[in-house]
Protein backbone atom coordinates (compact mmCIF):
# COMPACT_ATOMS: atom_id res chain seq x y z
CA UNK A 1 0.00 0.00 0.00
CA UNK A 2 1.24 3.47 -0.88
CA UNK A 3 1.57 6.33 1.59
CA UNK A 4 -0.96 8.43 -0.31
CA UNK A 5 -3.54 5.62 -0.05
CA UNK A 6 -3.02 5.42 3.70
CA UNK A 7 -3.30 9.19 3.96
CA UNK A 8 -6.62 9.00 2.18
CA UNK A 9 -7.85 6.34 4.62
CA UNK A 10 -6.80 8.46 7.58
CA UNK A 11 -8.53 11.53 6.12
CA UNK A 12 -11.70 9.49 5.66
CA UNK A 13 -11.65 8.13 9.20
CA UNK A 14 -11.22 11.62 10.67
CA UNK A 15 -14.18 12.83 8.61
CA UNK A 16 -16.32 9.84 9.61
CA UNK A 17 -15.40 10.06 13.29
CA UNK A 18 -16.32 13.74 13.44
CA UNK A 19 -19.48 13.10 11.47
CA UNK A 20 -20.65 10.46 13.97
CA UNK A 21 -20.15 13.01 16.75
CA UNK A 22 -22.81 15.31 15.25
CA UNK A 23 -25.85 13.35 16.46
CA UNK A 24 -24.09 12.52 19.74
CA UNK A 25 -23.62 16.26 20.33
CA UNK A 26 -27.41 16.75 20.26
CA UNK A 27 -27.95 14.44 23.23
CA UNK A 28 -28.22 15.37 26.86
CA UNK A 29 -25.17 14.82 29.04
CA UNK A 30 -27.10 12.03 30.78
CA UNK A 31 -27.72 10.27 27.46
CA UNK A 32 -24.07 10.72 26.50
CA UNK A 33 -22.92 9.17 29.79
CA UNK A 34 -25.57 6.44 30.08
CA UNK A 35 -24.36 2.84 30.41
CA UNK A 36 -26.27 0.97 27.72
CA UNK A 37 -24.70 -2.44 28.23
CA UNK A 38 -22.49 -2.19 25.15
CA UNK A 39 -18.93 -3.49 25.00
CA UNK A 40 -17.67 -0.16 26.36
CA UNK A 41 -20.77 0.77 28.32
CA UNK A 42 -22.44 3.38 26.17
CA UNK A 43 -21.74 6.26 23.84
CA UNK A 44 -19.16 8.01 26.02
CA UNK A 45 -17.34 4.77 26.80
CA UNK A 46 -17.22 3.70 23.15
CA UNK A 47 -16.06 7.09 21.94
CA UNK A 48 -13.46 7.32 24.73
CA UNK A 49 -12.19 3.90 23.65
CA UNK A 50 -11.86 5.16 20.08
CA UNK A 51 -9.88 8.22 21.17
CA UNK A 52 -7.73 6.04 23.43
CA UNK A 53 -7.05 3.58 20.61
CA UNK A 54 -6.08 6.31 18.16
CA UNK A 55 -3.63 7.71 20.71
CA UNK A 56 -2.30 4.28 21.71
CA UNK A 57 -1.53 3.30 18.11
CA UNK A 58 0.12 6.64 17.37
CA UNK A 59 2.33 6.16 20.41
CA UNK A 60 3.21 2.63 19.31
CA UNK A 61 4.13 3.86 15.82
CA UNK A 62 6.43 6.38 17.47
CA UNK A 63 8.11 3.57 19.44
CA UNK A 64 6.50 4.28 22.81
CA UNK A 65 5.39 1.63 25.28
CA UNK A 66 1.81 0.95 26.41
CA UNK A 67 0.35 3.34 28.96
CA UNK A 68 -2.76 3.48 31.11
CA UNK A 69 -6.12 3.69 29.40
CA UNK A 70 -7.80 7.04 29.04
CA UNK A 71 -10.54 7.21 31.67
CA UNK A 72 -13.89 8.04 30.08
CA UNK A 73 -14.46 10.32 33.08
CA UNK A 74 -12.01 12.73 31.45
CA UNK A 75 -14.85 13.55 29.06
CA UNK A 76 -17.71 15.23 30.93
CA UNK A 77 -19.35 16.04 27.60
CA UNK A 78 -19.01 15.63 23.85
CA UNK A 79 -17.11 18.90 23.45
CA UNK A 80 -14.30 17.71 25.75
CA UNK A 81 -14.09 14.42 23.88
CA UNK A 82 -14.07 16.08 20.46
CA UNK A 83 -11.36 18.52 21.54
CA UNK A 84 -9.11 15.71 22.79
CA UNK A 85 -9.72 13.64 19.65
CA UNK A 86 -8.91 16.59 17.42
CA UNK A 87 -5.63 17.06 19.26
CA UNK A 88 -4.73 13.37 18.79
CA UNK A 89 -5.61 13.65 15.09
CA UNK A 90 -3.42 16.73 14.67
CA UNK A 91 -0.47 14.91 16.24
CA UNK A 92 -1.10 11.88 14.03
CA UNK A 93 -1.36 14.05 10.92
CA UNK A 94 1.92 15.81 11.69
CA UNK A 95 3.62 12.45 12.32
CA UNK A 96 2.18 10.99 9.11
CA UNK A 97 3.27 13.95 6.99
CA UNK A 98 6.82 13.42 8.23
CA UNK A 99 6.97 9.79 7.05
CA UNK A 100 8.98 8.86 3.99
CA UNK A 101 6.90 6.79 1.53
CA UNK A 102 9.13 3.75 2.09
CA UNK A 103 8.47 3.78 5.84
CA UNK A 104 4.89 2.57 5.45
CA UNK A 105 6.20 -0.90 4.57
CA UNK A 106 8.69 -1.08 7.42
CA UNK A 107 7.94 -3.29 10.41
CA UNK A 108 6.76 -1.76 13.66
CA UNK A 109 7.59 -3.57 16.87
CA UNK A 110 5.19 -2.91 19.71
CA UNK A 111 3.82 -4.39 22.90
CA UNK A 112 0.20 -5.14 23.57
CA UNK A 113 -1.31 -3.96 26.85
CA UNK A 114 -0.60 -7.39 28.34
CA UNK A 115 3.12 -6.94 27.59
CA UNK A 116 3.40 -9.34 24.65
CA UNK A 117 5.69 -8.31 21.79
CA UNK A 118 4.31 -8.05 18.26
CA UNK A 119 5.50 -6.86 14.87
CA UNK A 120 3.67 -5.84 11.69
CA UNK A 121 4.26 -3.52 8.74
CA UNK A 122 3.13 0.03 9.47
CA UNK A 123 0.59 0.03 6.64
CA UNK A 124 -1.24 -2.94 8.19
CA UNK A 125 -1.44 -1.19 11.53
CA UNK A 126 -2.82 1.98 9.93
CA UNK A 127 -5.42 -0.13 8.12
CA UNK A 128 -6.28 -1.71 11.46
CA UNK A 129 -6.86 1.70 13.07
CA UNK A 130 -9.18 2.76 10.26
CA UNK A 131 -11.09 -0.53 10.41
CA UNK A 132 -11.30 -0.34 14.22
CA UNK A 133 -12.97 3.07 14.00
CA UNK A 134 -15.41 1.80 11.38
CA UNK A 135 -16.41 -1.07 13.67
CA UNK A 136 -17.09 1.23 16.61
CA UNK A 137 -18.95 3.81 14.50
CA UNK A 138 -21.36 0.99 13.72
CA UNK A 139 -21.79 0.38 17.44
CA UNK A 140 -22.41 4.08 18.03
CA UNK A 141 -25.06 4.11 15.33
CA UNK A 142 -26.81 1.18 17.02
CA UNK A 143 -26.66 2.90 20.42
CA UNK A 144 -28.07 6.11 18.93
CA UNK A 145 -30.94 4.15 17.39
CA UNK A 146 -31.56 2.44 20.74
CA UNK A 147 -32.32 5.76 22.37
CA UNK A 148 -34.29 7.09 19.41
CA UNK A 149 -31.68 9.61 18.29
CA UNK A 150 -30.95 10.66 14.75
CA UNK A 151 -28.10 8.86 12.99
CA UNK A 152 -25.80 9.78 10.11
CA UNK A 153 -24.19 7.75 7.36
CA UNK A 154 -20.40 7.54 7.51
CA UNK A 155 -19.80 5.52 4.36
CA UNK A 156 -16.58 6.21 2.50
CA UNK A 157 -18.49 6.74 -0.74
CA UNK A 158 -20.28 9.71 0.87
CA UNK A 159 -16.92 11.17 1.90
CA UNK A 160 -15.70 10.68 -1.69
CA UNK A 161 -18.74 12.47 -3.10
CA UNK A 162 -18.35 15.38 -0.69
CA UNK A 163 -14.63 15.64 -1.49
CA UNK A 164 -15.40 15.81 -5.23
CA UNK A 165 -17.98 18.54 -4.68
CA UNK A 166 -15.51 20.56 -2.58
CA UNK A 167 -12.80 20.13 -5.24
CA UNK A 168 -15.15 21.40 -7.97
CA UNK A 169 -16.05 24.44 -5.87
CA UNK A 170 -12.37 25.25 -5.40
CA UNK A 171 -11.75 24.94 -9.14
CA UNK A 172 -14.22 27.47 -9.96
What is the predicted role of each segment?
Residues 7-71, 112-172:
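Short, contiguous alpha-helical
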Residues 108-110:
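Short acidic-hydrophobic surface loop/beta-edge motif
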Amino acid sequence: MQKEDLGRLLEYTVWANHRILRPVATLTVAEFKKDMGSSHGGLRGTLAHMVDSDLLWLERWKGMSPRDLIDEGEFPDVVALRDRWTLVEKHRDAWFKGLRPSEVSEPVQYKSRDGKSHEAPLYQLIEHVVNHSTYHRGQITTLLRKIGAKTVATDMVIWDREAKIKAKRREG
